[in-house]
């Protein structure tokens, strides 16, 4: 194989082209590639951090939701307990009021019975005195009437 001037010229031109590319073209391309690599690495790291933050936030939300559910259940339990207490208090008050009303009714009936009984005794005594006056045929004085009535009332 012959090495002629064309081949040497081509070698020199190629060497100059390689040197020119390495000096002026290659560094901006390498910088662009490195910049892009760092951007991609940062984006991946940011995505990973966001994914971790999302998982942490999801766990926090689940914990807060569980705590809120427990708190809501506690509030419902307390409300039900208070409702039952109020119902028991109202029932007790109603029973107490019922007992008072019944006792008052019995007392009123008993007082009315005693009043009617006393009224009846007085009428019976007056009738007895009137009957005795008619039998005796004369009138007994007022003081004697009262004495007789008092004795009859005491006996009844």
Swiss-Prot record:
NCBIfam families: ATP_synt_b, PRK05759.1-2, PRK05759.1-4. SUPFAM superfamilies: F1F0 ATP synthase subunit B, membrane domain. It is found in: Cell inner membrane. PANTHER family: ATP SYNTHASE SUBUNIT B, ATP SYNTHASE SUBUNIT B', CHLOROPLASTIC. Belongs to the ATPase B chain family. F(1)F(0) ATP synthase produces ATP from ADP in the presence of a proton or sodium gradient. F-type ATPases consist of two structural domains, F(1) containing the extramembraneous catalytic core and F(0) containing the membrane proton channel, linked together by a central stalk and a peripheral stalk. During catalysis, ATP synthesis in the catalytic domain of F(1) is coupled via a rotary mechanism of the central stalk subunits to proton translocation. Component of the F(0) channel, it forms part of the peripheral stalk, linking F(1) to F(0). This is ATP synthase subunit b. F-type ATPases have 2 components, F(1) - the catalytic core - and F(0) - the membrane proton channel. F(1) has five subunits: alpha(3), beta(3), gamma(1), delta(1), epsilon(1). F(0) has three main subunits: a(1), b(2) and c(10-14). The alpha and beta chains form an alternating ring which encloses part of the gamma chain. F(1) is attached to F(0) by a central stalk formed by the gamma and epsilon chains, while a peripheral stalk is formed by the delta and b chains. Coiled coil: none annotated. The keyword Nucleotidyltransferase does not apply. It is a single-pass membrane protein. One of its GO terms (molecular function) is proton-transporting ATP synthase activity, rotational mechanism. The chain crosses the membrane at residues 11-31. InterPro entries: ATP_synth_B-like_membr_sf, ATP_synth_b/b'su_bac/chlpt, ATP_synth_F0_bsu_bac, ATP_synthase_B_chain. Gene3D superfamilies: F1F0 ATP synthase subunit B, membrane domain. The gene is atpF. CDD domains: ATP-synt_Fo_b (cd06503). Pfam families: ATP-synt_B. One of its GO terms (cellular component) is plasma membrane. Keywords: ATP synthesis, Cell inner membrane, Cell membrane, CF(0), Hydrogen ion transport, Ion transport, Membrane, Transmembrane, Transmembrane helix, Transport. Its main location: membrane.
């Amino acid at each position: 194989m012959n090495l002629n001037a064309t081949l040497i010229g081509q070698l020199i031109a190629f060497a100059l082209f390689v040197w020119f590319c390495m000096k002026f073209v290659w560094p901006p391309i390498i910088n662009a590639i490195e910049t892009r690599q760092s951007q991609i690495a940062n984006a991946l790291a940011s995505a990973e951090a966001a994914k971790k933050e999302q998982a942490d936030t999801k766990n926090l939300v689940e914990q807060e939701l569980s705590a809120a559910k427990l708190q809501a259940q506690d509030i419902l339990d307390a409300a039900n307990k208070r409702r039952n207490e109020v119902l028991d208090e109202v029932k007790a008050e109603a029973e107490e009021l019922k007992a008072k009303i019944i006792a008052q009714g019995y007392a009123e009936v008993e007082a009315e019975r005693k009043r009617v009984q006393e009224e009846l005794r007085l009428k019976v005594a007056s009738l007895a005195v009137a009957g005795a006056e008619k039998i005796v045929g004369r009138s007994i004085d007022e003081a004697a009437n009262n004495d007789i009535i008092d004795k009859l009332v005491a006996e009844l």
